[in-house]
Amino acid sequence: MEEFQRHIELDRSWQHNLIYPLIFQEYIYAFAYDHGLNKSILLENASDKKYSLLIVKRLITRMYQQNHSILSANDSNQNEIFGHKQKKNLYSQMITEGFSVIVEIPFFPLLISSLEGKEIVKSQNLRSIHSIFPFLEDKFLYLNYVLGILIPYPAHLEISVQTLRYWLKDASSLHLLRFFLYEYRNWNSLITPKEFISFFSKRNQRLFLFLYNFHVCEYESLFVFLRNQSSYLRSXSFGVLLERIYFYGKVKYLGKNFPKDFRVILWFFKXPFLHYVRYQGTILLASKGTSLLIHKWKYYLIYFWQCDFSVWXQPRRIYINRLSNHSLDFMGFLSSVRMNSSVIRSQMSQNSFLIENIIKKFDXIVPIIPLVGSLAKAKFCNVLGPPISKSAWTDLSDSEIIDRFGHICRKVSHXXSGSSRKKSLYRIKYILRLSCARTLSRKHKSTVRAFLKRLGSEFLEEFFTEEEKVLSLTLPRDSSTSWGFYIYRRRIWYLDVICIHNLTNDE
């Protein structure tokens, strides 16, 4: 952020929300490519304060050149591998990465406020993603229905460009954005979600993730506004929602004619508080209301996406869970509300009777099958679970092998510590430990038993049990409960759980 503040000057074009001239700044591409490719191509004859057509012209020219002898010597090995089409995509991707940095600039509140000398407006509705953990612990028990939604992708990326028009008043930049979108694929055809995700992961991640995040942000801002409007007593109805016109008059009428059942009826019309939670591409709408209310919200969301965003939301991507009967798959946990019944025998005078108490308890379980599948995909075990050696790491030093296994083990431990039952977590740790031992024994051409006997079983223990200093959330603990039982049974929410990547990315 400080680098952007130091380089970007508030000139006349910037004051009019024109970001197109920034495309010809060399330092933009240095920021975008401060890792990976050789930056000598980008920084030749660089000037920090002058606009230059040289860099972009050179890259665009190389996209259409068949003779690539002008590349630097450091790129020669890479160029022998790439064909002409790959080279063309490589140079185009370099421009796209630079454009991705530029198009994000108007959406940096801290940067814009510092350049314009304004204070950041604090939104009252802004919530940290870490508020999901208190929601699961405190609110989940008292809810009846949860509406799970997979956010639909735009059927055509032109929809995202049109939405971006309202925020980015720069026609030249929007035309260049369309050029990048049509460069790689014929976007006239509809995109299935699977193809869309696959395209995200292969190239131009930054640009397309920006468009997707902007699409989600725009949807949320409009949806939250409409949701707040629908909660006011005097607001008009929204199609399938309950009618709220002249609600004060209806309340007075109900109070006069139904004095006994007035509270129940008033609660029904007011619509109980609706919790909104989003994690990545999944949305949860949770309510204490009835099945009728949650179904109305389901169809309202379908119409909302179709009418306001021209997005077709498939009904199979929206599911309704009754928490008393089903588990909720969210953030890698199977969350449910478990009923614990206890019978107490009481006696008054000569009469004795039994009192049955039912206590709701939040239960979160980590499914073991997907975790074992991830380990098998990363070659730590086979599909059935038995550990195997990581042959790709046998060329590394012993300390680096142990450090990698320990790093993955700690990350898995952090991700699964919110579970109420730790048995599956201990099984994953066992697989990683034995896989580490098999990898080391394979490197030294020995058996696992002989290797551990020579170094001792405590050799791996200290690396896998050492915890990183990470902030966590825990519930209050009873002083009479032993610490070992507490660690085994209680849930610990590590705040870095949202930053943990897939196991295959740790290679």
From Swiss-Prot:
It is found in: Plastid, Chloroplast. The keyword DNA repair does not apply. Keywords: Chloroplast, mRNA processing, Plastid, RNA-binding, tRNA processing. The keyword Protein transport does not apply. Transmembrane segments: none annotated. One of its GO terms (molecular function) is RNA binding. GO terms for biological process: mRNA processing; RNA splicing; tRNA processing. It holds the Pfam family Intron_maturas2. InterPro entries: Domain_X, Maturase_MatK, Maturase_MatK_N. GO terms for cellular component: chloroplast. Usually encoded in the trnK tRNA gene intron. Probably assists in splicing its own and other chloroplast group II introns. HAMAP family: MatK. Belongs to the intron maturase 2 family. MatK subfamily. This is Maturase K. It comes from Kali turgidum (Prickly saltwort).
